[in-house]
Amino acid sequence: MARYDRAITVFSPDGHLFQVEYALEAVRKGNAAVGVRGTDTVVLAVEKKSTPKLQDSRSARKIVSLDNHIALACAGLKADARVLINKARIECQSHRLTLEDPVTVEYITRYIAGLQQKYTQSGGVRPFGLSTLIVGFDPYSRLPSLYQTDPSGTFSAWKANATGRNSNSIREFLEKNYKESSGQETIKLAIRALLEVVESGGKNIEVAVMTREETGLRQLEEAEIDAIVAKIEAEKAAAEAAKKGPPKET
């Protein structure tokens, strides 16, 4: 095996950092995650695996709060996510304690992306094998935000985006169907996008919502998700029936 394939800080002759590319591959094999930014709502939806009967499903959640006004979902290695989330939470608390002000969504995104980039350039470590979707409301303007970071340390702002397995298919769906909306329509779009790749319906979907009016992140209950999925399926069936037209008379 070539030296640049083993070493994190050595470029290959054609300009690749293979350890970063391997981390990106870990993201592509991870659970699908979707983020949608509405006018007054931000939504994160992730694909979740079925939990054993004896496991507390709350301990396996993939959407977490970083602060009262910021939440994060990720795709990739769960253990790596735990480390990154803990560091981000400490930074949020430190910022409040030192400056007596909450962090902005962009600030904590830059911090997380900076950590990920640092781990592509340092000896004795490896890149974080995860990509994050970060949503929240600016504490001053109260405007909604959605950002994505990846293992290379790159970050960017989005109206709607996806990461994890089949993220390209989900992103194409979002590009065709995204309209700036509010409330339930934003939630419905996120779930519709995830259903493009999740075949088992609402039981394997985790959804969390943050609104301008309410403080904190609200995890949707299974019954709420099932009701929205049923509505989406009914609308889809009605649209297909409309395409076929009325039955022909014999």
Curated annotation (Swiss-Prot):
One of its GO terms (cellular component) is vacuole. It comes from the Eukaryota. Keywords: Cytoplasm, Isopeptide bond, Nucleus, Proteasome, Ubl conjugation. There is a cross-link at residue 62 (Glycyl lysine isopeptide (Lys-Gly) (interchain with G-Cter in ubiquitin)). GO terms for biological process: ubiquitin-dependent protein catabolic process. The keyword Flavoprotein does not apply. Transmembrane segments: none annotated. It is found in: Cytoplasm; Nucleus. Component of the 20S core complex of the 26S proteasome. The 26S proteasome is composed of a core protease (CP), known as the 20S proteasome, capped at one or both ends by the 19S regulatory particle (RP/PA700). The 20S proteasome core is composed of 28 subunits that are arranged in four stacked rings, resulting in a barrel-shaped structure. The two end rings are each formed by seven alpha subunits, and the two central rings are each formed by seven beta subunits. The catalytic chamber with the active sites is on the inside of the barrel. Belongs to the peptidase T1A family. NCBIfam families: PRK03996.1 (NF003075). The proteasome is a multicatalytic proteinase complex which is characterized by its ability to cleave peptides with Arg, Phe, Tyr, Leu, and Glu adjacent to the leaving group at neutral or slightly basic pH. The proteasome has an ATP-dependent proteolytic activity. This is Proteasome subunit alpha type-7-B. It comes from Arabidopsis thaliana.
